[in-house]
Amino acid sequence: VGEGGTAAPCAAIAAARQGTRTALIHARPVLGGNASSEIRIHISGADQSLKQTDYAEGGLVYEMMLDNKACNDDFCYSIWDSVLFEKAKAEKNLTVFFNTVMYDVETDGDRISAIYCFQETTEMRYRFTAPLFADCTGNGTLGYFAGAEYRQGSEAKSEFGEPTAPEEANNDRMGNTI
C-alpha cells in the first residue's frame, strides 16, 4: 500500500485482516497524511459541509474515529497520530515502513509488479513485489510512475452521479483528506 494518508491505513488494515501479508510504505514519520499532526486538517469526508446529515463515514475510518474519541476528546493531533499507529501495529500481517519514499516501479504489461523505495532514516533501498498494489498516495504517484492515464480536478456531477459534485468539470483540487 503506497503512502500513509487516511485511505492507506484503511486499505492496509483491511488487507491484513483478510490474511494478506501487507506492507504500508509511507514517506513521512506519522500516518494520517493531511489529517496528521504534520498538517492538521481534520477528516471531513462524507459530511464535509456539516449539512449532509444523511452521510457519515463508516468502516475503518469510523472505527479509528471511535478509538480516537475514547482517548482524545479534545482532538490533539499527536494523539490521533498514535491512534493510527497503534491501529496499524495491532495487525500481525501488516508492516509499516515509515520515512520510506517510493521512487520507481516495474511493470509487467499493464500491471505494477514491483516498486522501488528508499528509507531515508536507514539509507536502505527496498524492492517490494506483490500481485496487487494499492495507490493511496492522494496524487496517483504509483499509477503515474507506471504510465497510467490520470486527470486532475473535479469531475462533473453528470459523470458519476455524485449529488454534491459541481455541475461542470473544473480544475479545483481539495486540500483535505477523504
Residue ranges and their predicted role:
Residues 12, 33-40, 127-128, 140-149, ...:
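Short, solvent-exposed loop/turn and secondary-structure capping segments
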Residues 122-132:
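Core beta-strand elements of the Rossmann-like FAD/NAD(P) dinucleotide-binding domain
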Residues 135-178:
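Glycine-rich loop(s) and the adjacent beta-strand/alpha-helix scaffold that form part
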Residues 1-23:
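N-terminal Rossmann-like FAD-binding beta1-loop-alpha1 element of flavoenzymes
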Residues 14, 20-21, 26-111, 151, ...:
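Conserved N-terminal/central alpha/beta ligand/cofactor-binding core
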Residues 2, 26-27, 98, 129-130, ...:
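A secondary-structure boundary/capping signal
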